[in-house]
Amino acid sequence: DARSMSLETWELLSYVVTAVGLPLAIIVFLYEQKRERDNEEEEVYQLLSDNYQDFLKVALDNPDLRLFSAEQTPDLTKEQRERKIIIFNMLISLFERAYLLLYEPKMSPQQARRWSSWADYMREWCRREDFRALLPVLLEGEDAEFVSYIRTLAGSKSARQPAPEQAAAR
């Protein structure tokens, strides 16, 4: 009789382990999957940020183009115009990559925070008159949704107004 009781006890314990352990294992699995996704998203964001830093170095290496000025640089030589178009193409390519990898119609607060920094970069560059003027050429062959996004951004009032620091410098 003691033997059958221990068998019943073991059977009951196995049901309890199954009833508790399986849902717990699923929860742990889902948590690990989310954490892995978050880490991958953070890695993508970091790589894009590093690429933007590299772009800024290229812009700094070309001071004659005055790429950090809000106004269009006047009287550029043919070679300078060509360099500027190449640099702006690099920037559009980076913006498109950021859009394709980071933008989602519905984002978590963390995703929205990451995306907002890129939206700010895009808005900042769209404030440049010469950048906006070159957009039709720069956007040829780019992703249609990205093209629509950047055109909307470039056409917005905030893109046409100088940034606060630019307005203060005047």
Which ranges hold each PLM region?
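Alpha-helical transmembrane segments of integral membrane proteins
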Residues: 18-28
